[in-house]
Regions:
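Long, ordered, helix-rich scaffold segments
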Residues: 3-210
Length: 210
């Protein structure tokens, strides 16, 4: 681990060192739990830049370290009024490998920093879950598909342009096994039956079902 500069600098050498440091930290996070927990917590609390802080937070989430919840709460408490910074936090929450990630995402729909009227928040939470957490989105029970159907139903009237982009993971059904294709097709049929279905959604849904 290199010794950080006392002052954050955007120099090629410093950027390279941060990149290497954070790659090493992520590998270490999957090693001995106590040591990983200490190292990740230390980097998060001593970080003098967002890159290092987010790298520590990401490692804690990916490896499901004991410090994860406390660090996520600290980040939330500090940055909840900064939407763009919180987008990073929502993405980490939505792409977590935790078994209860869908439950977490549903709960975050009520978070103080989240709103269905902001496309960036929608993409960072709902979009990240559907598009960047395949294990959870494609759960065998179809719960991920049903969640997206609920969100798209809301957005169909609220913001059809955003809905049209969010549906992408659901219309790629032909890439998956027969069981998942069946559930994805059922989800698309459910959306197709909506009253006042937007033109953009209708076009994508009918093409996927053809």
């Amino acid at each position: 681990m290199y010794k950080r500069q006392s002052e954050y600098r955007v120099e090629h050498e410093d950027i390279a060192k941060r990149t290497l440091r954070n790659a090493c930290l992520r590998f270490l996070a999957f090693g001995e739990t106590h040591l990983a927990d200490v190292l990740v917590s230390k980097q998060f609390h001593e970080a003098n830049n967002m890159t290092d802080a987010l790298a520590a937070l990401s490692a804690a989430v990916a490896a499901q370290l004991p410090c994860r919840d406390a660090l996520m709460q600290e980040y939330d408490d500090k940055w909840h009024q900064d939407g763009l910074v919180m987008d990073k936090w929502f993405i980490l929450q939505a792409t977590s490998p935790a078994a209860n990630v869908l439950e977490t995402v549903r709960g975050l729909l009520q978070h103080r920093a989240f709103t269905m009227s902001n496309p960036n928040r929608i993409r960072s939470l709902i979009g990240a879950f559907a598009g960047s957490n395949p294990a959870a989105f494609h759960a065998e029970d179809g719960s991920g598909y049903q969640f997206l159907v609920e969100m798209l139903t809301d957005l169909n009237s609220r913001n059809p342009q955003v809905a049209s982009r969010l549906i992408e993971p659901l219309i790629r059904l032909k890439r998956y096994d027969a069981k998942r294709q069946e559930k994805m097709r059922a989800a698309l049929e459910q959306l197709k039956g909506l009253e006042n279905l937007s033109g953009d959604l209708y076009e994508k849904i009918t093409k996927a079902l053809a």
